Curated annotation (Swiss-Prot):
An annotated GO BP: tRNA wobble position uridine thiolation
Keyword DNA repair among record annotations: no
Entry protein name: tRNA-specific 2-thiouridylase MnmA
Residues with site note (Interaction with tRNA): H129, Q345
Species name: Serratia proteamaculans (strain 568)
Source lineage: Bacteria, Pseudomonadati, Pseudomonadota, Gammaproteobacteria, Enterobacterales
Region (Interaction with target base in tRNA): 98-100
Binding site for ATP: G12, M13, S14, G15, G16, V17, D18, S19, M38, G128
Disulfide bonds: C103-C200
Length: 367
């Protein structure tokens, strides 16, 4: 065991079970540990405020139990400028962004990393993400978490090897039930707390209500692939490719009894295009073009290569061939067609356990 007693780690404490156990595991490994609670959003209603206050109280209770200090910092301005405004712009353009990926890129592994190093004198930061770090030839790799159900490498693909090298991910070596068991043994208040779901700044609220506050909804027609108007949508931003629920056109059927799915968004004309059946050709893609690329090793691509890709979280890995088009764009060809490839979402690439990096889906390629 290397001597960690001179190394200071700041753990991002969210008030959840994963970050709680992260702090404990690092203590066990001999590090000097302190916590940091980040406030990334200025709440605008009582329910949100209560939820944030509970999270802070839980984080404080865990730190008290472990005998470590808890610092707090307000990153709401950085969050608004670097995550939220971009999120709204993407929705306005008819795309479906992933704010969690942006939050990791701009806040947790940038603002937090800088604050921990510069203001708190940290050697490392740590988070409760289910990923692993592997150091090879003085470069750090990002690996999938041991628990395949919980692996979060999809959300961390923008990290550089330098950022990975400054980060510790102890729960990535464990399965989730084991993490809960440790928390229960320690009698931490977060042991039975349910995992947070949804986008960090929306919490458990209805997404539609939230978006409607910031973007004016523009109703328009829902049109089938055959050109028939089958209903009205309340705003393209409320819909995503492959969506089935919430279209309000259940009774309308073509010749088949299959349910309707969103297969396209015509932003220029404010038309939502639908078709019946989850394997309708208009829903399937043979590949994609991705941009805003981030490779963990930060090396440029030299030519085509084989790997696997995920076009959304928790998807099965898809074997594919990646071909560089220029420095910031790649073409990806799947071995088999894939449903509901969604512009604005991220395509993340893997070689076995290693997360290579990824990019934003600019367009899908169809036959």
């Amino acid at each position: 065991m290397s001597d960690n007693s001179q190394k200071k780690v700041i753990v991002g404490m969210s008030g959840g079970v994963d970050s709680s156990v992260t702090a404990y595991l690092l203590q066990q490994q001999g590090y000097q540990v302190a916590g940091l609670f980040m406030k990334n959003w200025e709440e605008d209603d009582d329910e949100e405020y209560c939820s944030a206050a509970t999270d802070l109280a839980d984080a404080q209770a865990v730190c008290d139990k472990l005998g470590i200090e808890l610092h707090t910092v307000n990153f709401a301005a950085e969050y608004w400028d670097n995550v939220f405004e971009l999120f709204l712009e993407e929705y306005k353009a008819g795309r479906t962004p992933n704010p969690d990926i942006l939050c990791n890129k701009e806040i947790k592994f940038k603002a937090f990393l800088e604050f921990a190093a510069e203001d708190l004198g940290a050697d490392f930061i740590a988070t409760g993400h289910y990923v692993r770090r592997q150091d090879v030839d003085s470069k750090s790799r990002l690996l999938r978490g041991v628990d395949g159900n919980k692996d979060q490498s999809y959300f961390l693909y923008t990290l550089s090897h330098e950022q990975v090298a400054q980060s510790l991910f102890p729960v990535g070596e464990l399965e989730k039930p084991e993490v809960r068991r440790i928390a229960e043994q320690l009698e931490l208040v977060t042991a039975k707390k349910k995992d947070s779901t949804g986008i960090c700044f929306i919490g458990e609220r209805k997404f539609r209500d939230f978006l409607g506050r910031y973007l004016p909804a523009q109703p328009g027609p829902i049109v089938s692939v055959d050109g028939q108007t089958v209903g009205e949508h309340q705003g393209l931003m409320y819909h995503t490719l492959g969506q089935r629920k919430g279209l309000g056109i259940g009774g309308m059927k073509d010749s088949s009894e299959d349910p309707w799915y969103v297969v396209d968004k015509d932003v220029a004309n404010n038309v939502l295009v639908v078709a019946q059946g989850h394997e309708h050709p208009r829903l399937m893609s043979v590949g994609l073009i991705a941009q805003q690329l981030h490779w963990v090793d930060r090396l440029p691509l030299s030519g085509p290569f084989r790997c696997t890709v995920k076009t959304r979280y928790r998807q099965q890995d898809i074997p594919c061939t990646v071909t560089p088009l220029d420095e910031q764009r790649i073409e990806v060809r799947f071995d088999e067609p894939v449903a509901a490839v969604t512009p604005g979402q991220s395509a993340v690439f893997y070689q076995d356990e290693i997360c290579l990096g990824g990019g934003i889906i600019e367009q899908r390629l169809q036959e």
